[in-house]
C-alpha cells in the first residue's frame, strides 16, 4: 500500500530534451520511410497500371487477331459449305437424270425383246438367224449394258451424295463451333474495366485439359476444308463422268437403233422381193396347170376319138370272118385291117402314156402350187411380223435425229428419248 502511494519518477531536464529529440528523430525517420514508400507505391501503381493497360491492350489485340483468324476460317468453311451444298444439289439433279435415263431405257428394252419374241413366230425357212435378229440381239445387249452402267453410276452418285452430306455435317458442326467461339470472343473483346457483370471466377486461370493446341486447331480446320475440297473435286469429276456416260450411251443406242431400223428395211425388201418372185412363179405355175389341164383334156379326147376307128376296124375284121369257103382269103384288105387295129392300139397306148405323164406332171404342178402358196404365206407372215408388229411398235421409240438429248440422257422431256 505504501508503494502504491509512491509518487511517479522524476526526470532531469536533459533527459526531457533528449527524449523529445529522440521522438523527433524517430518521427522524421518514420515519415521519411513512409514518404519513400508512398513514392515507391505511386511508381509501382503507375508501373502496374501501365503494365496492366499494355497487357490488356495486348490481350485485346490477340483477341482481335484471334477473331480475324476464326472469321477467316469461318468464311473458308462458309464458302466450302456453300459450294458443297450447290454440288450436292447438282448431284441430286444428276441422280434424277440418271434415274430418268434408266427408266427411259425400259420401254426400248421391252420393245426390242418383244420384237425378238415376235420374230420367233416366223415359220419354215424364214426362221433364220438373220441380220435383223443379230442387230436386235445386239441392241438388247447394249441396253442391258447401258442399264447396268447407269445402275452402277447411280450407286456412285448416291454414295457421293452421302459423302457430301457427311462433309457438310462436319462443316456445319465446325461452323457452329466457330460461330460460338466468335460470339464468345466478341463478348470478351468488348469487355472493359467499366463493363457490368465482370467479376472474379475461381479456377479459371488454367489450361483446360480437353483443350487443343493451335496447331491441332489449324490442322482440324484445314482438314475439314481439305475433306470438303476432296468431295467437291470428286463431285465435279462424277458430274463430268455422268454427262459423258449419258451422252455416250445415248449416242451408242441411237446409232444401234438406226442400224436395227436399217436392217428391218433391208430385210423387208429382201422378203418382199422373194415373195414377189414366188408370186411370179406361182402365176406361171398356175398358167402351166391350166395349160396341162387342157392338154390332158385333149389327150383324153384324142383317146376317145380313137374308139370309133377301132370299132370300125374290129367290126370289119369280125364281119369278114363270115366270108364263105375260099373267099375267106388273107387278102391285102385283111392284113391292112389288122395293121390298122395295131396302129390304133399303138397310138392309144402312146396317148395313154402321154396322158399318164401329163397327169403326173399336173400332180407335180399342183404340189408346186401348194408349196409356192405355203412359201408365200411364210413370207407374208414374216412381212407381217417385221412390218406390222415390229416396225410399227418401234415407231413408239421417239425420233433418233440427235437434236435433243432426251430421256436417254436424263432430259426433262420424256417424249424426246433419242
Curated annotation (Swiss-Prot):
Family: Belongs to the tektin family.
Domain of life: Eukaryota
Keywords: Cell projection, Cilium, Coiled coil, Cytoplasm, Cytoskeleton, Flagellum, Microtubule, Ubl conjugation
The record's account of how the chain is modified after translation: Ubiquitinated, leading to its degradation. Deubiquitinated by USP16, promoting its stability.
Function summary: Microtubule inner protein (MIP) part of the dynein-decorated doublet microtubules (DMTs) in cilia and flagellar axoneme. Forms filamentous polymers in the walls of ciliary and flagellar microtubules.
Annotated gene: Tekt1
Organism: Mus musculus (Mouse)
Coiled coil: 20-107, 134-177, 266-308, 332-383
Subunit: Microtubule inner protein component of sperm flagellar doublet microtubules.
Name of the molecule in the record: Tektin-1
Chaperone in keyword set: no
Gene Ontology biological process: flagellated sperm motility
GO cellular component terms, semicolon-separated: axonemal A tubule inner sheath; axonemal microtubule; microtubule cytoskeleton; sperm flagellum
Compartments, as annotated in UniProt: Cytoplasm, Cytoskeleton, Cilium axoneme; Cytoplasm, Cytoskeleton, Flagellum axoneme
Keyword check for Repeat: no
Amino acid at each position: 500500500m505504501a508503494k502504491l502511494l509512491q509518487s511517479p519518477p522524476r526526470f532531469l531536464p536533459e533527459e526531457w530534451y533528449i527524449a523529445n529529440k529522440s521522438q523527433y528523430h524517430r518521427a522524421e525517420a518514420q515519415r521519411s520511410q513512409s514518404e519513400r514508400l508512398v513514392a515507391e507505391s505511386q511508381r509501382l501503381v503507375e508501373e502496374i497500371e501501365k503494365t496492366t493497360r499494355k497487357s490488356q491492350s495486348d490481350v485485346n489485340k490477340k483477341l482481335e487477331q484471334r477473331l480475324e483468324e476464326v472469321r477467316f476460317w469461318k468464311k473458308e468453311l462458309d464458302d466450302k459449305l456453300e459450294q458443297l451444298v450447290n454440288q450436292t444439289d447438282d448431284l441430286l439433279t444428276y441422280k434424277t437424270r440418271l434415274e430418268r435415263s434408266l427408266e427411259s431405257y425400259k420401254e426400248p428394252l421391252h420393245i426390242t425383246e418383244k420384237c425378238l419374241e415376235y420374230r420367233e413366230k416366223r415359220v419354215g425357212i424364214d426362221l433364220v438367224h438373220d441380220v435383223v435378229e443379230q442387230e436386235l440381239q445386239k441392241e438388247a445387249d447394249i441396253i442391258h449394258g447401258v442399264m447396268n452402267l447407269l445402275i452402277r453410276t447411280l450407286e456412285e452418285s448416291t454414295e457421293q451424295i452421302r459423302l457430301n452430306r457427311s462433309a457438310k455435317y462436319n462443316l456445319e458442326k465446325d461452323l457452329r463451333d466457330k460461330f460460338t467461339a466468335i460470339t464468345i470472343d466478341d463478348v470478351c473483346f468488348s469487355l472493359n474495366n467499366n463493363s457490368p457483370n465482370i467479376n472474379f471466377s475461381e479456377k479459371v486461370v488454367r489450361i483446360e485439359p480437353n483443350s487443343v493446341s493451335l496447331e491441332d486447331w489449324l490442322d482440324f480446320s484445314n482438314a475439314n476444308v481439305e475433306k470438303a475440297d476432296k468431295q467437291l473435286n470428286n463431285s465435279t469429276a462424277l458430274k463430268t463422268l455422268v454427262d459423258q456416260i449419258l451422252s455416250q450411251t445415248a449416242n451408242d443406242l441411237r446409232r444401234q437403233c438406226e442400224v436395227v431400223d436399217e436392217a428391218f428395211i433391208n430385210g423387208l425388201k429382201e422378203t418382199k422381193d422373194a415373195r414377189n418372185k414366188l408370186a411370179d412363179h406361182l402365176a406361171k405355175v398356175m398358167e402351166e396347170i391350166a395349160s396341162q389341164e387342157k392338154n390332158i383334156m385333149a389327150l383324153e379326147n384324142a383317146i376317145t376319138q380313137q374308139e370309133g376307128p377301132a370299132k370300125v376296124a374290129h367290126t370289119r375284121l369280125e364281119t369278114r370272118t363270115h366270108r364263105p369257103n375260099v373267099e375267106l382269103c388273107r387278102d391285102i384288105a385283111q392284113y391292112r385291117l389288122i395293121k390298122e387295129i395295131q396302129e390304133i392300139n399303138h397310138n392309144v397306148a402312146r396317148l395313154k402314156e402321154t396322158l399318164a405323164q401329163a397327169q403326173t406332171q399336173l400332180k407335180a404342178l399342183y404340189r408346186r402350187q401348194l408349196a409356192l402358196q405355203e412359201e408365200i404365206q411364210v413370207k407374208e407372215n414374216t412381212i407381217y411380223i417385221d412390218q406390222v408388229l415390229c416396225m410399227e411398235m418401234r415407231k413408239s421409240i421417239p425420233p433418233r435425229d440427235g437434236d435433243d438429248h432426251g430421256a436417254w440422257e436424263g432430259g426433262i422431256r420424256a417424249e424426246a428419248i433419242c
